[in-house]
A protein has these predicted regions:
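Phosphate- and other anionic-substrate recognition elements at nucleic-acid/protein interfaces
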Residues: 43-224
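Functional cation/ligand-contacting sites centered on basic and imidazole/sulfhydryl donors
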Residues: 1-45
């Protein structure tokens, strides 16, 4: 550029072209397109649920990092992750249970969509690690967590569904032969739908929420 007032063309992290001067950019690096996307301004502020709104809380649960998304009448309004680094499985399960109670209490969903668990396929081969077939221990760990989440929803009188992975992926048109390819495909789709770049856990949770909000309707809860 020739001087501080020369127009520059730069690209933001989301791939949008920004036309501005270095005088402005060096003070505040801001993309006008991203600024208008409310999903880019994710905060901890709880959005009150409007009357007659159907709200879905979707979970891509795991014992260390769980993705979540919240939809109001098929519209994504919030997404993120919950992380815990506690050493014992039961401690992590308890932390996620308490987090779910907090999310339900604060966000007041009509439905909680939980990703169903599945045994990981190993290409027809049994691969042993110690005295366990690889995949079985992870399956058991996720089964424990799934049961805890289901029981928590039951105790709080919240409707819930289990979303089989192949089902929600087919609904969202997630492609790919390998697990890594399907994870990447979900991230690309989220970028296409909402113009946001998200983690694998967030992408899956957003896909689960999209599937649940577009295919399931249950009674609306009259929260006090």
């Amino acid at each position: 550029y020739k001087n501080l007032d020369s127009e520059l063309i730069v690209e933001c992290p989301e791939g949008h072209r920004v036309y501005s001067t270095w005088k402005k950019l060096r003070v505040k690096k801001e993309c006008p397109v991203c600024k208008q996307n409310i999903l880019k301004e994710i905060t901890t502020k709880i959005i009150p649920k409007k009357k007659d709104t159907y709200r879905v809380l979707a979970l891509d649960q795991a014992t260390y990092i769980s993705g979540f998304s919240i939809y109001d009448d098929k519209k994504l309004i919030r997404y993120g992750t919950f992380e815990t680094a506690l050493s014992e499985e039961i401690e992590r399960d308890d932390a996620i249970r308490k987090w779910l109670i907090s999310m339900v209490t604060n966000w007041k969903p009509d439905l909680v969509a939980i990703e169903d668990i599945q045994m990981q396929q190993l290409g027809g081969k049994q691969v042993y690690g110690g005295d366990n077939v690889v995949g079985i221990q992870t399956f058991k760990t996720l089964a424990h967590l799934q049961g805890i989440l289901m029981e928590t929803c039951f105790e709080m009188d919240i409707s819930f569904i289990l979303c089989p992975t192949p089902t929600w992926r087919a609904h969202c048109q997630v492609k790919g032969r390998s697990r890594a390819d399907r994870k990447k495909s979900a991230q690309i789709l989220v970028k296409e739908w909402f113009d946001i770049s998200v983690s694998e856990d967030e992408a899956d949770a957003i896909g689960i929420g999209k599937y649940a909000s577009e295919t399931h309707t249950v009674r609306k809860i009259q929260w006090q």
